[in-house]
Regions:
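Short, small-residue-biased leader/transition segments that mark boundaries at the very start
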Residues: 3-4
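Short catalytic-loop micro-motif centered on adjacent basic/acidic residues
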Residues: 15-20
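Gly-rich Lys/Arg/Thr-decorated short loops/hinges at beta-loop-alpha junctions or inter-strand turns
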Residues: 9-14, 109
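Short, amphipathic C-terminal "tail helix"
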Residues: 133-157
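Glycine/aspartate-rich loop-and-adjacent alpha/beta segment that forms the canonical ThDP
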Residues: 30-126, 130, 143-144, 157
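Active-site glycine- and acidic-residue-rich loops that bind
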Residues: 21-29
Length: 157
């Protein structure tokens, strides 16, 4: 799923959005409307907690969990609209703020991750660190990609 957005975006002719309705309902609705109106292939990738995630707070708190996922940097909200490039604008819109919540606390809020800590604490700590670094690197890469797509003056189509 993490490569899916970038792969679709790289083709240059696919509308693609990554959403989480609990984190930002307006962004989700905007993405759905844009995808529907796009005259070409559209792809919406949605973060949706399920019972297998083992939310410690309970499934009735899944909307809150989506916010945590975005705020921690586990899931980024973004849209890529090829029409914007044709209009001389940046086609990549990042709709989530820079992560500002504890990433590992987010992971530990789900049994699917927290159970590893009980079985092998040292290995879990290493994997949590790697996952957090990967999330930070993904966000930095996303910012770099957005910056690289900024239209250059005088080059608008």
């Amino acid at each position: 799923r993490r490569v899916l957005f970038r792969s679709a975006m790289t083709s240059g002719h696919v509308y693609v959005a990554q959403v989480a309705i609990g984190a930002n309902p307006a962004q989700t609705l905007k993405a759905l409307r844009e995808a529907e109106s796009y005259d070409g292939p559209s792809l919406i990738i949605a973060y949706a907690p399920c019972i297998n995630h083992g939310l410690k707070a309970g499934m009735n708190r899944s909307m809150v969990e989506m916010k945590k996922a975005v705020r921690a940097g586990y899931w980024n909200l973004m849209r890529f609209d090829p029409r914007l490039a044709e209009a001389g604008k940046n086609p990549l819109q990042i709709d989530s703020a820079k992560p500002n919540e504890d990433y590992q606390s987010f992971l530990k809020g789900e049994v699917r991750y927290a159970s590893l800590t009980m079985k092998n604490p040292a290995h879990a700590a290493m994997l949590y660190e790697e996952s957090e670094k990967s999330a930070k690197d993904r966000y930095d890469s996303l910012i770099q990609k957005r910056n690289s797509l900024e239209p250059k003056e005088g080059l608008a189509k």
